[in-house]
Amino acid sequence: MNFETIIGLEVHVELNTNSKIFSPSSAHFGEDPNANTNVIDWSFPGVLPVMNKGVIDAGIKAALALNMDIHKEMHFDRKNYFYPDNPKAYQISQFDEPIGYNGWIEIKLEDGSTKKIRIERAHLEEDAGKNTHGTDGYSYVDLNRQGVPLIEIVSEADMRSPEEAYAYLTALKEIIQYTGISDVKMEEGSMRVDANISLRPYGQEQFGTKTELKNLNSFSNVRKGLEFEVERQAKLLRSGGVIRQETRRYDEANKGTILMRVKEGAADYRYFPEPDLPLYEIDDAWIDEMRAQLPQFPAQRRAKYEEELGLSAYDASQLTATKVLSDFFETAVSLGGDAKQVSNWLQGEIAQFLNAEGKTIEEIALTPENLVEMIAIIADGTISSKMAKKVFVHLAKNGGSARAYVEKAGLVQISDPAVLVPIIHQVFADNEAAVADFKSGKRNADKAFTGFLMKATKGQANPQVAQQLLAQELQKLRD
């Protein structure tokens, strides 16, 4: 029997507000344990939550970016459960009226086609703390993360393969990153993914029993975990077994999934309205204000790059991978840079430099203005493409004018025949054996003179002009 794969994803995105959702503590990542906490985070008796308006702003932006409807009257709920990293014994979340609902995004499949994935809801909530189990037999609680604002984005079960799930996550990450509400760094926990997967016989309308996957710390592991579950569940069903509703974690070392617990349902959490927070009214003016702050998103930019700038689909995809890279490209083009040349530099030398340095483009000194000027002095013959690589490294580390640096460092390309011809004659005089080989008709003897000339000019001879003049002067030797 063959089965159809049904996948839905729950993505937790940590919002990059300065303070937490209900307390004034810093929400920044990487501090010493419990450094970013106060009495609200520790749930001291009598303390009350105070809503961070910036979190609602971010929620509205996310809902708009994901083509969602927005609840104009929004409230919070208590999700009750006990765990050491949750000192209140409940989490403030949203249950029946999330900030956003009925959304969708479009993903691009491996064959080049597109598919619309529906999004059921996006709700705001507070993050829990973190438990660390030490080798000394003790467990430690760090509440720095307690109260950090999250938006949970829940897709419909519209994905039919691990590859589609991977494409959905890639598209979702791009969109959220473009809004500026999160840096979506999985390695820092600001984007976390849970996957729900079930199988059903082809032709059956009813979904099968789903399994939830956790501990998916990379998009690659999401795909691997789902691929393993497809095989595990299919094998179990074909042998007459029954799929239980359970939570499993992906074990990267063993490339498989391991049972964590039997899955709870909503009733287990005993949701009820949060009594310490009011109803929040989101009017059209507020929504319009947030909409005005949104940028053009990756799909629209890719279409523009292909249709208006003549770039390939691959180039357009690479350039829109992050908003900062896309903004850099667009600024450079707006300053007169040739789109293809700018694209080549961003994907070539610049990308290699960034990878080697472990930096992003906003962390180096190169500006779009610097890059456009450098491309211009390559085009007008001031420097060669080879010399430009050296110039770029200087600009990346120090910034400044490309032309000014080239002139100060004595890197201006020599293109004047009146300067080059005497140097060529001196090369002939200094290399009599090579001249003799050339005159005797020795094969490829002329090739050596290019190297001699570049050495004599310290690499500053214009390669095209040098080759032309060498050919002329060598012909005179032959004659």
UniProtKB/Swiss-Prot annotation:
Gene3D superfamilies xrefs: 1.10.10.410, GatB domain, N-terminal subdomain (1.10.150.380)
MF terms in GO: asparaginyl-tRNA synthase (glutamine-hydrolyzing) activity; ATP binding; glutaminyl-tRNA synthase (glutamine-hydrolyzing) activity
Catalytic activity, reaction form: L-glutamyl-tRNA(Gln) + L-glutamine + ATP + H2O = L-glutaminyl-tRNA(Gln) + L-glutamate + ADP + phosphate + H(+); L-aspartyl-tRNA(Asn) + L-glutamine + ATP + H2O = L-asparaginyl-tRNA(Asn) + L-glutamate + ADP + phosphate + 2 H(+)
Domain of life: Bacteria
Broadest EC class assigned to this enzyme: ligase
GO biological process: glutaminyl-tRNAGln biosynthesis via transamidation; translation
Any Pfam family the entry gives: GatB_Yqey
Classification via PROSITE patterns: GATB (PS01234)
EC number: 6.3.5.-
Keywords: ATP-binding, Ligase, Nucleotide-binding, Protein biosynthesis
UniProt record similarity statement: Belongs to the GatB/GatE family. GatB subfamily.
Function recorded in the entry: Allows the formation of correctly charged Asn-tRNA(Asn) or Gln-tRNA(Gln) through the transamidation of misacylated Asp-tRNA(Asn) or Glu-tRNA(Gln) in organisms which lack either or both of asparaginyl-tRNA or glutaminyl-tRNA synthetases. The reaction takes place in the presence of glutamine and ATP through an activated phospho-Asp-tRNA(Asn) or phospho-Glu-tRNA(Gln).
Subunit record text: Heterotrimer of A, B and C subunits.
Protein name per UniProt: Aspartyl/glutamyl-tRNA(Asn/Gln) amidotransferase subunit B
Origin species: Streptococcus pyogenes serotype M18 (strain MGAS8232)
